[in-house]
Design a protein with these regions (language model features):
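Conserved serine/cysteine hydrolase catalytic core
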Residues: 243-299, 308-309
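Short, surface-exposed "cap/lid" segments of acyl-processing enzymes
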Residues: 52-114
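Flexible "cap/lid" loop of the alpha/beta hydrolase fold
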Residues: 162, 166-202
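Catalytic active-site module of serine/aspartate enzymes centered on a nucleophile-bearing elbow/loop
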Residues: 3, 276, 302-341
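Conserved alpha/beta-hydrolase catalytic His-Asp/Glu region
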Residues: 211-253, 263-265
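N-terminal cap/lid segment of alpha/beta-hydrolase-fold proteins
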Residues: 34-59
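Gly/Ala-rich beta-loop-alpha elbow adjacent to hydrolase catalytic centers
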Residues: 148-153, 157
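Active-site loop/oxyanion-hole signature of alpha/beta-hydrolase fold enzymes
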Residues: 106-146
Length: 341
């Protein structure tokens, strides 16, 4: 069940955690602009922080790495579940792949936190979009923005591009969920659950009841359900956040509002108008971002840079170290090519 929920779709000092990552030596600005991925110093270290930030009164989990002299700022929006700790290895790999030229802020979804800071308040897709816009205002980010979104986060990133046209220089969607897939049996099942108050309540209560189990048992369930390919970080994120009653309620409620909104036709006109600023990465077997959508984007907005990942990673790339590293390097390559124009 934890695996299925994970597939749906990113105050106290004791909450703040630090991790180690590697970074490059200081290099000239010209080299920074070219983003040389090979000249990395294996001896230098710095901390990546998981911190709480109040955004419009909503306590938000932020996974962040700050560059000393950033030439741009990457703001990452997760999919649903919007548990940002799933993306630890990805954020580390992205910062490293960019050679320390950019700060990276990964912004968790409102209400998808480990603790129930918002006392059970539910957040819709539109409220998640507003939340990400407000984060940028609160942080007073001055450097040019590169917006990166995963799954429904890709849709959110596009809406951020719409509302921040002067500040956002690039928008990258990873395994993007931009419209309903009427051919997907999995999505048909999900629709029945999230649109039914009875079924969604039953799922919520069942998943939330799992937190009563010892942590070791929860971890075993996660490992048996998701397999050995998942990273330790992904298993921990699954066990710490998803069984929380307030989190799973928000996951299902957000999914409900996603399916309602994405039943509409995508705004192709907006994508055509901004096609030089947009890139999408699709997967081979991904019902959230199927290849027929890849083909439709290609027809509707031919100037959008489209790629297909053929390395065997999944929609949940962030749950494996190999997937996190590959996608991070792909993003760095896209940005490098964009800046070289």
């Amino acid at each position: 069940m934890l695996a299925r929920i994970a597939a749906l779709t990113e105050r106290p000092r004791s909450f703040i955690r630090s991790f180690k990552y590697r970074r490059t030596d200081s290099i000239p600005n010209s080299s920074r602009r070219e983003m040389d991925f090979t000249d990395l110093d294996s001896n230098a270290t710095k901390c990546v922080n998981l911190r709480l930030c109040s955004v419009s009164g909503c306590m938000t989990e932020i996974l962040e790495i700050r560059a000393d002299r950033p030439s741009f700022h990457v703001v990452f929006v997760p999919g649903n579940p919007g548990v940002i700790t799933f993306y630890k290895e990805f954020v580390e790999s992205l910062f490293k792949s960019l050679g320390g030229t950019a700060s990276v802020s990964a912004v968790g979804a409102s209400g998808h936190t480990e603790k129930n800071w918002e006392h059970g308040k539910l957040y819709s897709l539109q409220e998640q979009i507003d939340h990400k816009i407000e984060f940028i205002k609160v942080q007073n980010i001055e450097a040019p923005l590169v917006l990166v979104g995963h799954s429904i986060g890709s849709y959110i990133a596009l809406e951020m591009l719409r509302r921040l046209p002067e500040k956002a220089m690039y928008c990258i969607g990873l395994y993007p969920f931009l419209a309903l897939n009427l051919q997907s049996k999995k999505q048909a099942v999900i629709v029945k659950v999230i649109m039914s108050r009875v079924l969604s309540t039953m799922v919520t209560l069942f998943v939330a009841s799992l937190r009563l189990l010892p942590r070791q048992v929860l971890r075993l369930i996660s490992e048996l359900s998701n397999g050995k390919s998942w990273s330790n970080t992904a298993h921990e994120a699954c066990c710490s956040h998803l069984p929380q009653y307030h989190t799973i309620r928000n996951v299902l409620y957000m999914a409900r509002t996603e399916f309602i909104k994405l039943s509409e036709t995508p705004d192709w006109e907006f994508m055509r108008e901004n096609q030089e600023k947009i890139s999408f990465l699709y997967g081979i077997d991904d019902h959230w971002g199927p290849l027929q959508m890849f083909e439709e984007v290609s027809r509707q907005a031919s100037g959008i840079a489209l790629s297909i990942e053929r390395e065997g990673h999944t929609h949940g790339f962030c749950c494996t170290e190999a997937g996190s590293i590959w996608v991070a390097r792909h993003i760095a390559s896209l940005i490098k090519n964009k800046l070289a124009r």
